């Protein structure tokens, strides 16, 4: 039986990366519910794409296992794809979820949704569509938006001045400090790129820090010592 790795969180908020992806197939309702059923997780992270017919689905890569390119494929075709479980066997319930299904799971279980905007070229009107879907579920207050495109995070900040928004980055550049502080945007950074000095400096300026993707208890302990606010993980609990 697969199981999580237990740690002493000491108040750090754990985010289940693509759902509880260390146990269930990533970015499926099964993975979301596996995380939702565990009190240890503050939030559930996922990735959103727009299909060719204007639906919003959750998947990490831009192609599903059949090779279909999500932005150029209609929803019904994507939904018909049956994914494999962790053991390599197909499981009929493992299908590409929709954004509204994910939001409902987060809302029903009282978890924060951490939603990565995957398409850097996504027009502002499509960002509004994503926001409207979440509003229709009456759960905008329960969502954190994240993304590697600072421009897209700025777009969301302008549309939703009070929303929690995190800029994703593989690395640290000195110019990020002013960018984040000036625009009220938090940092979601690959853990190896975060120094203790920068963590303290960001916190003093009111910027929250999320690190990804940390699956080592020893590494987590180090960054908990830095005072990070969130740890995104596949398996730590």
Give the location of each predicted region.
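Phosphate-group recognition and catalysis centered on beta-loop-alpha active-site segments
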Residues: 1-237
